[in-house]
């Protein structure tokens, strides 16, 4: 305190020395008397100095908060001052990962969702740049791109084979990680120093981007190549629910036994869980770095800036996807072939008196050959359904009960792959109630929650 007092007196003396001529001039042509002018100037100078010290102290506090957050902590005392600040994606935290990429040969695993927020206007309008374009502009040595299902530019149908090629905008080689080449080959990783994974997931087990991440991390571990995951929000991250994957039914639609249909984790959290729980099944551990978000929590509602895949066109579709995605294993059309993908369901054989919404699927972007192409479907319009916080099986259960050809309702192999268990189809066919079915998976969900809790980066 004594040092501060001496500093204040010293600064005041210096300022008065240089400003004395100005003060004399002001007094000469002012109605204020000399003592009043002197006191006013002194008060003004003192106030300016105090404000400067105060601003400096606030800057120091801000830096300490950023340091705490960047250390990946969820200590609520540490982040209380910035909980109302805007969300910062992992991809936007260039200061955290650019030093790791300098001088390295880098491969990006990405698709159209790999966006960085460039600027936000006062009216809320946002401008984005693709991660690949951003890294190239910062002189990062990108050597190629790996792309997941739907391709790097996101134009392929679900399940459609995506061929290797060259990105027309950047000229970079694009290697498909879908179809027969789901895992990067050793020759495709030759000479690579770093892998950067940045893809928007939607938090649903049968959404294939987690499987792609699994294979990328597995190949990286075997080749001793570090992996950086740029974390993004989970739009379905506020709850954990649904049937749990059984080991005998694991596939590209669900790689890990014991995981519920909705896991409630960000892709960065899930990556850490895969690595630490030894789900990669590699002799070497993967060298994994997760760049966490700032100011995020699992209850936050996040509106995606672009569709994460061709048939999830908006937030409503993303919200309903955990419930309606199971329709892929039934005879029901879930909106493919319309602009209302995963917001409507229907089929020609549902009774019109109970399913009054009509639509006709036609080939379109994301669905070249939809179920019931060109046929009138009776169904439900779910575009106004309020936000769900669970997997709602009522849509499928009621459709099954109202479907005339019950033996043709399920595609057993596909439904089991999506559900992760053969039990769910049997439960629906045997007439169990929604509540009975939901109760049947609660014990397994609790087991998963115990594992999940070890890897959460956010509240």
What are these regions (language model features)?
Residues 251-320:
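Conserved anion/nucleotide-ligand pocket segment
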Residues 162-191, 204:
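Glycine-rich oxoanion-binding loops at beta->alpha junctions
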Residues 201-213:
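Glycine/threonine-rich flexible loop motifs
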Residues 341, 345-440:
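Conserved functional hotspot residues or short segments at active or partner-binding sites
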Residues 153-158, 229-250:
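Glycine-rich, charge-decorated loop segments at or immediately adjacent to ligand/cofactor-binding or catalytic sites
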Residues 53-54:
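C-terminal motif of bacterial Sec signal peptides marking the signal peptidase cleavage site
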Residues 77-78, 134:
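Coil residues (strongly favoring Ser/Thr
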Residues 294-372:
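Glycine-rich, aromatic-lined ligand/substrate-binding cores of catalytic
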């Amino acid at each position: 305190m004594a040092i501060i007092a001496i500093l204040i007196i010293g600064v005041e003396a210096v300022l008065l020395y240089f400003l004395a001529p100005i003060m004399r001039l002001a007094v000469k042509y002012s109605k204020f008397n000399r003592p009043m002018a002197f006191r006013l100037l002194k008060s003004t100078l003192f106030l300016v100095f105090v404000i400067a010290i105060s601003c400096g102290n606030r800057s120091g506090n801000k830096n300490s908060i950023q340091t705490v957050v960047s250390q990946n902590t969820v200590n609520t005392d540490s982040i209380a001052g910035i909980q109302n600040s805007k969300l910062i994606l992992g991809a936007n935290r260039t200061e955290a990962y650019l030093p790791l990429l300098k001088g390295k040969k880098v491969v990006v695993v990405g698709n159209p969702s790999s966006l960085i927020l460039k600027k936000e206007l006062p009216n809320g309008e946002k401008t984005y740049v693709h991660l690949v374009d951003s890294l190239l502009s910062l002189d990062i040595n990108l050597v190629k791109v790996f792309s997941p299902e739907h391709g790097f530019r996101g134009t392929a149908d679900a399940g459609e084979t995506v061929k290797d090629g060259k990105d027309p905008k950047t000229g970079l080689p694009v290697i498909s990680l879908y179809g027969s080449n789901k895992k990067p080959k050793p020759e495709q990783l030759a000479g690579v120093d770093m892998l950067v994974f940045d893809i928007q997931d939607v938090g649903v087990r049968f959404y294939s981007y987690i499987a792609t991440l699994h294979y990328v991390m597995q190949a990286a571990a075997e080749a001793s190549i570090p992996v950086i995951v740029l974390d993004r929000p989970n739009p379905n991250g506020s709850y954990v629910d649904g049937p749990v994957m059984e080991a005998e039914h694991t596939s590209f639609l669900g790689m890990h036994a014991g995981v519920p249909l909705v896991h409630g984790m960000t892709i960065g959290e899930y990556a850490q869980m895969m690595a630490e729980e030894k789900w990669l099944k590699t002799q070497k551990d993967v060298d994994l770095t997760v760049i966490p978000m700032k100011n995020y929590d699992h209850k936050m509602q996040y509106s995606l800036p672009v569709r994460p895949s061709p048939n999830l066109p908006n937030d409503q579709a993303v919200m309903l996807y955990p419930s309606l995605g199971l329709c892929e294993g039934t005879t029901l059309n879930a909106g493919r072939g319309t602009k209302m993908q995963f917001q409507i369901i229907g089929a020609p054989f549902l009774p019109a008196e109970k399913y009054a919404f009509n639509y006709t699927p036609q080939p379109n972007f994301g669905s070249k050959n939809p179920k019931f192409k060109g046929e009138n479907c009776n169904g439900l319009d779910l575009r106004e359904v309020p936000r769900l916080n669970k997997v709602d099986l009522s849509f499928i259960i009621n459709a099954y009960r109202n479907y005339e050809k019950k033996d043709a309702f399920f595609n057993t192999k596909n439904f089991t792959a999506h559900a992760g268990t053969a039990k769910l189809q049997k439960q629906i066919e045997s007439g169990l109630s929604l509540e009975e079915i939901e109760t049947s998976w609660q014990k397994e969900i609790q087991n998963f929650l115990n594992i999940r809790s070890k890897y959460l980066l956010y509240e």
